[in-house]
Regions:
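Catalytic-domain carbohydrate-binding cleft regions of carbohydrate-active enzymes
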Residues: 1-477
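Solvent-exposed beta-hairpin/edge-strand motifs
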Residues: 450-461, 560-572
């Protein structure tokens, strides 16, 4: 739009639909592109690019889901994530030293607020040099990480592409001496980012990616579990990179939109090589297809109500565009959150695939306990709801690897025949079974909710509602969250953080349906060798049956269902 003419990511894909037809357009061109969708001329759609080939995919299908499935078969799908990545994550620019990080972890357990991940922003580094740790602020980095691991936390560290110009700094020396950095007029190109004068790796070159992947070992050897790629548009402090900066024979003009994608690929390869686990990478810059390597977030948002309102349509649109694993900074990154805004944001965020609280230096702290007891209690309540939903979300990610349909969805994707869903952007579906209608406005204790045809049940009270429009009460500690009739939901029973469960707990709702539940070790690639279980769960009201469709992993020791308040023990 006119206010935000360029964002962190380039995804040249859109869908056109009405009550009669639907199609998708993917413009496979990574140069600077322009889309004029009827603005200049009402009946004209215009697509242009500053260079490259005109590779245009016209994607048809009987439904919107068909289009998304076809599009993701072209660009790739998000790999099955590690289970812990679906948990609550805490970040700030920055937690400045070991004492602050360990106190943060202690407070999550003290206040009984579930949390799986702590993120370390740029100040953990030695003078912002990538692949280093500060000897002054983090003198015992590995011991700190070990302590966090023993308390059930994983650790994510940020890295940037900008590599400090410093004689004797091995990462810099290798990149320069092996000509693996950008040049201008035949000389190493230097701009400024956090470390000061910096060079830019040529991630479009395989040799550079391989080197970067091996550098990741410096962090994984310290126990780091995952990597957050930032500033990889690439960002610069002394003006944008000139378009003729040379990246291994390719101009910045051509590579700009792909730079973050190549960095994410290198980071993914490094984590896979040096941990043998499913890589958890988060990237700020991305292009169509980056979902194969990385989770994304929407970037540096603000603690503003209209930014909260923007999150649901943003994440639903990213899901339609192949980015199944996406999130926005819970509470807002810039500016000061208030108790009300933080409370409403955590309620909204329980369905974000990436569930991370993040804020900027110089802003009011927004950890769950910093305001007052009421806010802390609300925050805890909805983090608990998120953890109940994790097995269901994990199932959605498994299904996404097959059909490309993201966990978070606009209502129209599930109810395309219902024209009332066409312009709804303040409600979303989590999978096919849960409708999420958070309060997104300040000072509001009621909201209008639209429920598609059929019966729906309040997730918290089990109140039954018919499809249609409803004005519902939603005081500050209440979230309008509804489950479709007949649904079967696997429920997480975690204590402080995500762990493998011995018991499968199901919530079963009046009606009938069949549900497929996926189980594996939650971290390795063993599932690619068939080491997983698939359970088919079917029911007509309280007559519940479970059978194994595929067995390659240890079974649950116990399966328990809850139907209308009644506990039912189930045998395979």
């Amino acid at each position: 739009n006119e206010q935000y003419r360029a964002l962190y990511k380039s995804v040249p894909f859109y869908i056109v639909f009405n009550s009669r037809f639907q199609y998708g357009i993917f413009f496979d061109n990574h140069f600077h592109t322009y889309f004029d969708l009827g603005k200049s001329y009402k009946d004209e759609l215009k697509v242009e690019a500053d260079g490259g080939n005109f590779n245009l995919f016209f994607i048809g299908g009987d439904t919107l889901k068909d289009i998304v499935t076809s599009y993701t078969s072209i660009t790739g799908r998000t790999h099955l994530p590690q289970l812990f990545t679906l948990g609550h994550q805490q970040s700030r620019w920055s937690y400045m030293n070991e004492k602050e990080v360990l106190e943060l972890a202690h407070n999550f357990r003290k206040y009984n607020i579930k949390c799986d991940v702590i993120h370390l922003d740029i100040d953990y580094m030695e003078r912002y040099k990538v692949f280093t740790t500060s000897k002054e602020s983090f003198p015992n980095f590995k011991e700190m990480v070990d302590s966090l691991h023993s308390s059930g936390f994983k650790v994510v560290t940020i890295i940037d592409p900008g590599t400090k110009v410093e004689k004797g700094y091995d990462t810099y020396e290798y990149l320069v001496n092996n000509k693996l950095c950008a040049t201008l007029n035949g000389e190493t190109y230097i701009n400024e980012v956090w470390p000061g004068e910096s060079i830019y790796p040529t991630f479009n070159k395989k040799e550079t990616r391989d080197f970067w992947a091996d550098e990741i070992k410096k962090l994984t050897d310290l126990g780091v579990d995952a990597i957050w790629d930032d500033m990889n548009e690439p960002a610069s402090f002394k003006g944008p990179l000139p378009l003729d900066v040379d990246f291994a024979g390719t101009s910045h003009k051509e590579i700009h939109n792909l730079y973050g994608n190549f960095m994410a690929e290198a980071t993914y390869d490094g984590l896979k090589k040096h941990t043998a686990k499913r890589p958890f990478v988060i990237t700020r810059a991305a292009f169509s297809g980056t979902q194969k390597y990385s989770t994304i977030w929407t970037g540096d948002n603000q603690s503003l109500w209209h930014h909260l309102r923007a999150n649901l349509p943003q994440l639903a649109s990213l899901g339609l565009s192949g980015f199944a694993f996406a999130g926005s900074d819970l509470g807002g990154f810039g500016g000061d959150a208030t108790p009300e805004l933080l409370s409403r944001w955590v309620e909204a965020a329980i369905v974000y695939p990436l569930f991370r609280n993040h804020s900027a230096m110089g802003t009011i702290r927004q950890e769950p306990w910093v305001f007052d007891k009421k806010t802390t209690d609300i925050y805890r309540k909805f983090v608990d709801v998120r953890y109940e939903l994790i097995p269901y979300i994990y199932d959605l990610f498994y299904k996404q690897t097959i059909d490309g349909i993201a966990p978070i969805r606009p209502l129209v994707l599930e109810y395309q025949e219902d024209e009332n869903t066409y312009k709804l952007n303040d409600e979303v579906m989590l999978g096919s079974n849960i409708l999420h209608a958070p309060v997104l406005d300040q000072g509001v204790d009621k909201r209008l909710v639209y429920l598609p045809k059929g019966k729906w049940y309040n997730y918290f009270t089990n109140e039954e509602l018919e499809g249609g429009y409803h004005i519902v009460d939603a005081p500050i500690d209440t979230l309008p969250l509804y489950v479709k009739e007949g649904s079967i939901l696997p429920i997480g029973t975690y204590e402080t953080h995500v762990e493998l469960l011995d018991e499968l707990v199901l919530k079963v709702y009046k009606g009938s349906s069949t549900y497929i539940h996926y189980q594996d070790d939650g971290e390795s690639f063993d599932y690619e060798q068939g080491k997983y279980n698939l359970y088919e769960i079917s029911h007509v009201d309280d007559d519940i049956k479970v059978k194994l469709l595929h067995e390659g992993y240890k079974r649950y020791k116990k399966i328990t269902a809850y139907y209308e308040g009644k506990k039912i023990d189930i045998k395979l």
